[in-house]
UniProtKB/Swiss-Prot annotation:
PANTHER family xrefs: NICOTINAMIDE-NUCLEOTIDE AMIDOHYDROLASE PNCC, NMN AMIDOHYDROLASE-LIKE PROTEIN YFAY
Protein name: CinA-like protein
Top-level taxon in the UniProt lineage: Bacteria
InterPro entries: CinA, CinA-like_C, CinA_C, Competence-induced_CinA, MoaB/Mog-like_dom_sf, MoaB/Mog_dom
Family listed: Belongs to the CinA family.
CDD domains (UniProt xref): cinA (cd00885)
HAMAP family tied to this protein: CinA_B
Alphabetical list of Pfam families matching this protein: CinA, MoCF_biosynth
Matching SMART domains: MoCF_biosynth
């Protein structure tokens, strides 16, 4: 089966928005053992849409078309598909009734423009959209099925998961015996990870892939077939052993997610004091429902004055050692923990750049501390200075990993291949 994707919209083509839908779809299909062969982005011009539908339908077996199903004049996917096939648009009565029902239920008058969303190519098969007003549909053109979905990410994800994946499994008799194990890593580059894993002799049906999403690199271990699935846990365990401290989570998208589920319902509490990370640690945890059960407070103490007045950092500590120092960050963590008597507190202070570095403390220098009821762990690390965002996100990841290792009763301070450390 040859799978392709067509993304529509001038704002996507012009780079005004990042096409996260395409990235999500490709990743999701890989998890089902299906690789996208080609992705095309086209603007909101009728003749361009018609041409790309006609041309790609000669080569693909299934094409997911994303976007252009709204009620406005620049939403032209349905019209373009009808013209590409040489047939009229006709009203789908079922979807019109669904639209009227939706607006009535929400106590709103339906604009006439929304009726456009019930107009589908004559040969189209309606595809339900349970969470929006844009009607999905599929049409056979040349050798391909074209499967139309709205550009709203939430709606796309529902339709792909609930309708697209089951359709292609039935239509193309895909083998459902596919399993995937994900290992999340920090502190090593993709090439360094590959150098360690490429020499491994993998069982038949097992393959390894890499996905860089800084500050993490995700290792995907695919198993295709019953025999490969049976040995997947053993293979994953061996890969973890080979990579050592680089592996920080299994089957989680981020370290924040790993920390969230370790603290959720644990009865333990966490406070955070952030300088260079600017609320990133706290924000990433708040993304998850239920974080209020363990997260007591997150403070952004960016100035020296706030470190002193809010966290109780001794002014002489700042004078003697500076804001970016082991001494200061330890006092920040202790102060954050003591405010509400939390079980744990994380603190960060660093130089994210691009300015502010010195010979002694260059850009990328970050001090991180973890305060516990039994004491304080701290380190000052040297991070790659490629960008301000990378310094901040890597700082948050190392802080999370310190807490993760403490929760597992492991050594809190460990070496990462691509992250240096200052001696205390």
């Amino acid at each position: 089966m040859k799978l392709e994707m067509i993304c529509t919209g001038e704002e996507v083509l012009a780079g005004q928005i990042v096409d996260t839908n395409a990235a999500w779809f490709a990743s999701t299909m890989m998890e089902h053992g299906v690789e996208i062969q080609r992705r095309v982005t086209v603007g909101d011009r009728l003749e361009d849409l018609i041409a790309v539908f006609q041309e790609r339908s000669l080569h693909a077996d299934i094409i997911l078309v994303n976007g252009g199903l709204g009620p406005t004049s620049d939403d032209m996917s349905a019209l373009a598909m009808a013209k590409a096939k040489g047939e009229p648009l006709v009203e789908n009565v079922e979807w019109r009734e669904r639209l009227e029902e939706w607006f009535t239920r929400n106590n709103r008058e339906m604009p006439l423009s929304n009726l456009k969303q019930a107009m589908l190519p004559a040969s189209a098969v309606m595809v339900d959209n349970p969470v929006g007003t844009a009607c999905g549909f599929r049409v056979k053109l040349n050798r391909a099925w074209l499967f139309f979905t709205p550009g709203v990410p939430f709606e796309l994800k529902h339709m792909v998961t609930e309708q697209f994946v089951p359709f292609i499994r039935d239509e193309f008799n895909l083998d459902s015996k596919v399993a995937l194990k994900k290992l999340l890593t920090i502190g090593q580059g993709e090439s360094a990870l590959a150098d360690k894993l490429e020499p491994l002799e993998l069982p038949e049906g097992i393959t390894i892939g890499y996905r860089s999403s800084m500050p993490h690199i995700e290792i995907k271990i695919f198993a295709r077939g019953e025999k490969a699935i049976a040995v997947l846990p053993r293979v994953a365990g061996h890969i973890k052993m080979v990579l050592g401290t680089a592996v920080v989570a299994e089957d989680k998208a981020t370290l924040a997610e790993e920390i969230h589920y370790k603290l959720l319902n644990s009865g333990l509490t966490l406070s955070v004091a952030e300088s260079c990370t600017g609320g990133m640690i706290t924000s990433q945890l708040v993304d998850f429902s239920g974080s209020s059960s363990y997260l007591q407070h997150g403070l952004v103490t960016y100035s020296n004055e706030s470190k002193v007045r809010v966290l109780g950092v001794n002014p002489s500590t700042l004078d003697d050692h500076g804001a970016v120092s082991i001494a200061t960050v330890e006092e920040m963590a202790k102060g954050a923990r003591q405010i509400l008597d939390s079980d744990y507190a994380l603190a960060t202070s660093g130089i994210a750049g691009p300015d502010g570095g010195t010979d002694e403390k260059p850009v990328g220098t970050v001090a991180i501390a973890l305060a516990t009821r039994g004491g304080v762990y701290s380190q000052m690390i040297k991070l790659p200075r490629r960008s301000r965002d990378l310094v901040r996100s890597l700082s948050a990841a190392v802080a999370y990993d310190m807490l993760r290792r403490e929760l597992l009763a492991e050594a809190v301070i460990v070496d990462y291949q691509s992250i240096g450390r200052f001696s205390k």
